[in-house]
Design a protein with these regions (language model features):
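Short beta-strand edge segments in extracellular beta-sheet folds
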Residues: 150, 162-166
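Mixed-charge, low-complexity intrinsically disordered regions
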Residues: 1-35, 46-48, 72-78
Length: 168
């Protein structure tokens, strides 16, 4: 890759699609370049693997310093299920950007629906949650995904959902 296809940190620019069949890791700077979410709502700390048009694995390090633990719940901190789902959606947004490459410029990924959400085990401070997202299908600007969140290799949550890719 030449310098024109790298960002200011020397990483492959998110506007460049990954080659089909290759798996890439993304650091937080590259994630923040790709999706608009910021503290306190950025729910992906790292991507350990993204395969264009197929799947993405994101990582969320769950810390007691997360703002939501002040109220959920003070005596027994548990990551809210809706934020686990949000982590899945943000990981899917990374997959969309990796897949679309330059065509992702000026687009946003809008969460449309969630189905079959199941929460198997609480996610607590100190956990490292791995979010596995797979693209199930794409029709025009509507994408469907399935996802599992895992801690220590065990499924803690799962869901299927749809997103719409629209201009900003």
């Amino acid at each position: 890759m030449n310098d024109a296809t790298r960002d200011e940190n020397g990483h492959p620019a998110p506007s460049q699609p990954t080659r089909a069949g290759t798996v890439e890791a993304w650091d937080i700077a590259r994630i923040m370049h790709a999706i608009p979410h910021r503290f306190p709502f950025l729910m992906v700390d790292r991507v350990i693997g993204v395969e264009r048009d197929v799947s993405c694995v994101g990582v969320k390090n769950v810390s007691i310093n997360e703002h939501y633990f002040q109220g959920h719940f003070p005596s027994m901190a548990v990551m809210p299920g809706v934020l686990i789902i949000e982590s899945m959606a943000q990981t899917a947004a990374v997959l969309v950007v990796a897949t679309l490459g330059d065509d992702a410029a000026g687009k946003l990924v809008y969460f449309m629906s969630v189905e079959g959400a199941k929460f198997r085990k609480p996610v607590v401070p100190g956990d490292q949650m791995h979010v596995h997202v797979r693209k199930e299908r794409r029709r025009g600007n509507i994408w469907k995904f399935s996802a599992e969140a895992k801690v220590d290799g065990k499924v803690v949550a799962e869901a299927s959902y749809a997103a719409m890719i629209l201009d900003r």
